[in-house]
Swiss-Prot record:
Compositional bias segments (type: Polar residues): 749-836
Protein's name in the database: Mediator of RNA polymerase II transcription subunit 15
CDD domains: gal11_coact
Modified residues (N-acetylserine): 2
Length: 1081
């Protein structure tokens, strides 16, 4: 791009600017002389003149503007000086007094003294005269400054004081696209610039020449006039339409009831008569909403009117926000507020009429039918009114894609039919009793107010579906009316359909969570890149079209997401929706300005994601609807079983459609679950076969014991608890959670189970295992045998089989001998209470909820321990003593703040850890720190590491017996570290057989720990799983050691002793002498 053009004001020479300063200074000095100023004031005036000229030069954009402003300022001040000088001269000529004295006397006229009294005072007290003269000069100077400030303020106010309409026009001019015919009149404009906001940015960057600026000003005026004329015509058209609506209003209160009572025959019209008309035709048809704004003072009190107006303004603002950045014009806002207040007035009139009709129904039984029809007509009118109003106001949204439109129409149709049926049932219930009618009227009003707030953002998405649903319901009602020969004797009893969103009253916690998630989403920092230049015109048009089609989908997902959260309590889903809402809003705003920040494929993925969101939300709403319908049917069957069949006659078609859709969904879900179960069973069978083959290959001697145990488990009189049937041949029923009996929650935490889990487990016994979540585990690969609770070792299997069985019945008597149960047979399993009910997998999973949380916490604890040790190795790499002591402190449960270090941590390391250095961490380092499971810091030369998940109660201590086990065998007169190293060598182990050093007895293998459950949780507990892959006593066996160690090997082992350099020094090193340890560091 070329360099910025040189401003013509820069061509002014210093001599010309000095000439302007002298001209301004001459006028100021004349005024100072007229005011009787001193030399000090003259010096200040010179400084002010220079500063004023410099400020004016910097403010001016051209030489012409600079010279005009300077000449105008000098001319104004010269005129002021001449006027004052003439006035002083005229007064002095009349009174024969010097001009300066006459000016001072005029300034002192407010004190009530005349010219003669002034002369007397001057003769009597010269000092007082001098004081008055000085005061007069100060007053004149102050007046001059005040006048200048007032002139500047008036100019600023003239620029700033704009009416709301002018301000709105200015704002509209900033974002309104400039017509191409006008844009061509401005030379040197880049092709991507089409708004005045962008032109202003170019001018501020000094990329436009003065000729361009002059042309831009002329074009701006023309464009402003065009917009003003267009707005004026729009206002006139709206005012004329409003006048027509006012002419259709009610002149008297008595006519309100006549206009509200529309005959039922007019409402039961064919669907095409109302669905194909536009909003203006609907307003002029039989569904015209009565206007009662001229009687607002008779309906509401002044306080109610003020509160209602404020409520209407807030509702209008909320509606404007839901349009994702689209601005509403002032006439549309006023029309919205008027219609909102009109609806409120109609609702109040309706409530009063309902109470009156209920009173008449109680006094006269013949008015029952009329009392039932009137509220239905009013409700239907209000529903039609909401449709017309929303169609008139929100016309910016467009239809969505065809694939999503069918789904949305079906969902909206079901939702609207439920609302209408609920309103009909409430209207019929109101005619029974006055108290009950008032309560239901209030509930209906609250429900309608909530529905209105939602319908304002969803009006266009449901307008067509509402009209179709109303016509369909009216046609059904008309058919039922013809089918009933005696409607008075057999009154219609409509069954109230459950509203899927009814009763979703959010708790205080829900409201707080939703607010917090919305606030967090609003703080999201979006870094969008302008890709406008990389897109073709065809791609731009496609992006605009798809965003316009998906706008309705975006609004619906954003509006229904909080309500679905109340059902599912899924915070991640709501958070994603809020974040995407901010993302979509930014995209739409940029697109409205002609800037594209996403490509076409990104828009496609975004719409697909929103469609998936909506489909998921629709399924949740339908599920809740099915639950509410079942609850209602159960309540109707329990409360009035004789009227169930008659109540269902009104909603047969609706229920059939809903049941068919739900049955299809359930059938698909069952098929998916069955396929998953079959796949899981096949995988489990394959795993079992592989494990059995490995078991027979590795431990052939253990097969008889397992077979005996399997036969014992299948014996009819044997009593083995449900949780203990986990042998090799009867394992599958645990994996198919649907067909198993319900496990009580208390069974997972019984003392007997904990005791059996902590028991010894023979490592050679091979059995299929599943994770036992009640055991604290720190290793993902750790799995404890399911037969650990009651399963004996292979040596005692026969003895156990001979033991006397318990007489209590086993819950798995019907299990087949091969251990793989048939699903059909599992359904016939009898419980102690009779027939065994079917349980789903959710109930079984809830039984292990406590253990799952514990296992998760232990897994996090393991990660924290590993991370703590890694940080210690990094920081204490030059201090083994601190590394050892801090690790030992963790084992003893000592807090980090109480641990002292022997070395001083370098300041560079402290700044790096605490992030207090001048050098900021890189993105990779910050990402690693965020993903770390602990927060690390160094305070007062102490390494403090706190858990991110449990900062206060986290402890890494272990039992003292386990700490003592490390030093097992060390005692007596032990002083030499080499003794510890040699004694711990596997070559000198007492477990080795002297006769055959390469072979060992099975009893001394000690693959499974025997002492405590803590050793099971140690990192070495995966030896058992590793031993499955190798043979015992093979070269890869970790427990197998060569018979003799060479001298070099012994020397290498000896050198492993810390702080030992030679054999002589090892004899002198006393482990109990602290000085030796400190000197070694």
């Amino acid at each position: 791009m070329s360099a910025a053009p040189v401003q013509d004001k820069d061509t002014l020479s210093n001599a010309e600017r000095a000439k302007n300063v002298n001209g301004l200074l001459q006028v100021l000095m004349d005024i100072n002389t007229l005011n009787g100023g001193s030399s000090d004031t003259a010096d200040k005036i010179r400084i002010h003149a220079k500063n004023f000229e410099a400020a004016l030069f910097a403010k001016s954009s051209s030489k012409k503007e600079y010279m005009d402003s300077m000449n105008e300022k000098v001319a104004v001040m010269r005129n002021t000086y001449n006027t004052r000088k003439n006035a002083v001269t005229a007064a002095a000529a009349n009174n024969n007094i010097k001009p300066v004295e006459q000016h001072h006397i005029n300034n002192l006229k407010n004190s009530g003294n005349s010219a003669n009294n002034m002369n007397v005072n001057m003769n009597l007290n010269p000092q007082m005269f001098l004081n008055q003269q000085a005061q007069a000069r100060q007053q004149v100077a102050q007046q001059l400054r005040n006048q200048q400030q007032q002139q500047q303020q008036q100019q600023q106010q003239q620029r700033r004081q704009l009416t709301p309409q002018q301000q709105q026009l200015v704002n509209q001019m900033k974002v309104a696209p400039i017509p191409k015919q006008l844009l061509q009149r401005i030379p040197n404009i880049p092709p991507n610039i089409n708004t005045w906001q962008q032109v202003t940015a170019l001018a501020q960057q000094k990329l436009l020449t003065p000729q361009d600026m002059e042309a831009a000003k002329e074009v701006y005026k023309i464009h402003q006039q065009l917009l003003f004329k267009a707005r004026l015509q729009q206002q006139q058209a709206q005012a004329q339409a409003q006048a027509n609506n006012n002419n259709n209003g009610l002149p008297q209160n008595g006519n309100i009831n006549n206009n509200i009572n529309i005959p039922q025959q007019q409402q039961m019209q064919p669907p095409n008569s109302s669905a194909n008309n536009n909003p203006l035709q609907q307003q002029s048809s039989q569904n015209t909403v009565p206007n009662v704004l001229n009687q607002i003072n008779q309906i509401f009190s002044p306080e109610e009117q003020r509160s209602l107006l404020q409520e209407a303004i807030e509702t209008c603002k909320n509606f404007e926000k839901t349009q994702l950045g689209s601005t509403m014009t002032e006439p549309v806002k006023q029309s919205f507020i008027r219609k909102y207040i009109n609806q409120k007035a109609l609702r109040k009139i309706q409530a009063l009429r309902d109470v009156k009709n209920n009173n008449n129904a109680n006094n006269n039984g013949s008015n029952l039918q009329r009392a039932q029809n009137v509220p239905m007509n009013i409700i239907q009118q209000q529903q039609q009114q909401n449709t017309n109003n929303n169609d008139t106001i929100a016309t910016s949204a467009t239809p969505n894609a065809a694939a999503f439109s069918q789904q949305q129409n079906a969902s909206s149709k079901l939702y609207q039919m439920q609302q209408q049926q609920q309103a009909q049932a409430q209207a019929q219930a109101q005619a029974q009793a006055q108290a009950q009618a008032q309560a239901q009227a209030q509930a209906a009003q609250a429900a309608q107010a909530q529905a209105q707030a939602q319908a304002q953002a969803q009006a266009q998405a449901q307008a067509q579906a509402q009209a179709q649903a109303q016509a369909q319901a009216q046609a059904q009602a008309q058919a039922q009316a013809h089918a009933q020969h005696q409607p008075s004797q057999q009154p219609q009893q409509a069954q109230q359909q459950p509203n899927p969103l009814h009763g979703l009253t959010p708790t205080a916690k829900d409201v707080e969570v939703i607010k917090q998630l919305s606030l967090d989403a609003s703080k999201t920092n979006l870094r969008l890149t302008d890709v406008t230049n990389s897109l073709s015109n065809e791609e731009k048009e496609k992006i605009k079209m798809k965003l316009k089609q998906g706008q309705k989908l975006f609004v619906q997902v954003s509006n229904f997401a909080p309500q679905v959260y109340i059902i599912t309590k899924n915070e991640n889903f709501l958070k994603e929706v809020f974040q995407l809402r901010i993302f979509v809003k930014e995209i739409l705003e940029k697109c409205a300005e002609g800037i594209f920040v996403v490509k076409l494929d990104t828009v496609d993925r975004l719409i697909i994601k929103y469609q998936k969101y909506w489909e998921s939300m629709r399924i949740q709403i339908l599920r809740r609807q099915a639950i509410l319908r079942q609850q209602q049917q159960m309540a109707n069957n329990n409360g009035n079983p004789g009227t169930t069949s008659t109540g269902n006659n009104n909603n047969i078609a609706t229920q059939q459609n809903m049941q068919q859709s739900l049955q299809q969904m359930q059938h698909l879900q069952q098929l998916k679950m069955q396929q998953q179960q079959q796949q899981q069973q096949q995988q489990q069978q394959q795993q079992q076969q592989q494990q059995q083959q490995q078991q027979q290959h590795i431990y052939p001697s253990s097969t008889p014991g397992v077979a005996n145990y399997s036969a014992m488990a299948n014996a009819p009189g044997n009593n083995i608890p449900y949780m203990n049937h986990k042998n090799t041949s009867s394992m599958d029923f645990l994996n198919s959670m649907e067909n198993t009996p319900k496990v009580p929650v208390s069974a997972a935490a019984t003392p007997s189970l904990n005791k059996t889990i902590n028991g010894k487990v023979n490592g050679r016994t091979k059995s299929n295992t599943i994770p036992v979540t009640s055991i604290p585990s720190t290793n993902k690969k750790l799995s404890i045998s399911n037969a650990a609770s009651q399963q004996p070792t292979p040596r005692s299997a026969s003895n156990t089989a001979k033991s006397t069985p318990n007489t209590n019945p086993s819950p798995l008597k019907t299990q087949t001998k091969n251990g793989t149960p048939n699903p059909n047979n599992m359904k016939t399993v009898q419980s102690p209470m009779g027939a065994q009910p079917s349980y789903n997998s959710a109930i079984i999973e809830n039984a292990f909820r406590k253990e799952e949380l514990l296992l998760k916490d232990l897994e996090i604890r393991k990660l924290e321990i590993s991370s703590r040790f890694k940080h210690r190795q990094e920081i204490f790499k030059d201090s083994p003593m601190d590394l050892f002591m801090s690790t030992l402190g963790d084992c003893l449960g000592i807090k980090d703040e109480e641990m002292l270090t022997s070395c001083t941590i370098p300041k560079a390391v402290v700044d790096h850890i605490n992030g207090s250095g001048k050098r900021k961490p890189t993105k990779a380092a910050q990402r690693a720190r965020d993903q770390d499971s602990i927060d690390i810091s160094i305070k007062d030369n102490k390494l403090v590491m706190k858990s991110k998940f449990n900062k206060s109660n986290r402890s890494y201590s272990i039992a003292l017996s386990n700490v003592a086990a490390i030093f097992k065998g060390i005692g007596g007169n032990f002083k030499d570290l080499s003794t510890l190293v040699h004694s711990s060598s596997p070559s000198t182990s007492s477990n080795m057989d002297v006769g055959n050093p390469r072979k060992r007895k099975a009893s001394v293998l000690e693959i499974s720990p025997q002492d405590s459950i803590a050793s099971v949780l140690s990192p070495d507990s995966n030896i058992m799983s590793d031993s499955k892959k190798i043979k015992v006593d093979s070269p890869d066996d970790p427990f197998m050691t060569k018979s003799g160690a060479t001298t070099s090997e012994k020397q290498e082992v000896t050198n492993e002793a810390p702080f030992l350099t030679s054999g002589t020094s090892s004899e002198q090193f006393n482990v109990w002498d602290w000085n030796n340890w400190t000197s070694a560091t």
